[in-house]
Amino acid sequence: MGYVIVATGVPGVGATTVTTEAVKELEGYEHVNYGDVMLEIAKEEGLVEHRDEIRKLPAEKQREIQRLAARRIAKMAEEKEGIIVDTHCTIKTPAGYLPGLPIWVLEELQPDVIVLIEADPDEIMMRRVKDSEERQRDYDRAHEIEEHQKMNRMAAMAYAALTGATVKIIENHDDRLEEAVREFVETVRSL
């Protein structure tokens, strides 16, 4: 069975950019977006046409799709050197923080390492402003972004306690993408 690496970070931190670049240097690894796999399954079942519609499905159906996506990703990992799963550690909602990797997902995925990609809250705020023309982003203040990153750390350690995974924190600062990518690649190669 190949390795399962979960890569995560708050919106705007650059987790997808780091993982997309890292996988280019990791032979036999594939980069998978968890939400894309969920959408694929929901479409196959004729439940949705677009990603935003998943949120409107009954909670039980969403959980089922989450579980099926985790199972599919774990199966993909069996056929590769490893899978890098790009997903949310926690999701900030009006009602509070939602775990991005509930127990039924962790049981299927069994990650080897959870990589938290972080940056300074001010850097993330500026990235979100730049991205706002292409993507719909939340405009959190620096202290809210800092809180979200802390919540991600706490959730990641809880996930690690449940699965035996390690937790690695990688900083992705402005104009230093190569350093973050190098550290990510080194982390994966150390497994």
UniProtKB/Swiss-Prot annotation:
Keywords: ATP-binding, Cytoplasm, Kinase, Nucleotide-binding, Transferase. Its EC number is 2.7.4.3. ATP binds at G9, V10, P11, G12, V13, G14, A15, T16, T17. It is found in: Cytoplasm. One of its GO terms (molecular function) is ATP binding. Its main location: cytoplasm. It catalyses: AMP + ATP = 2 ADP. SUPFAM superfamilies: P-loop containing nucleoside triphosphate hydrolases. InterPro entries: Adenylate_kinase_AdkA, P-loop_NTPase. One of its GO terms (cellular component) is cytoplasm. Belongs to the archaeal adenylate kinase family. This is Adenylate kinase. The gene is adkA.
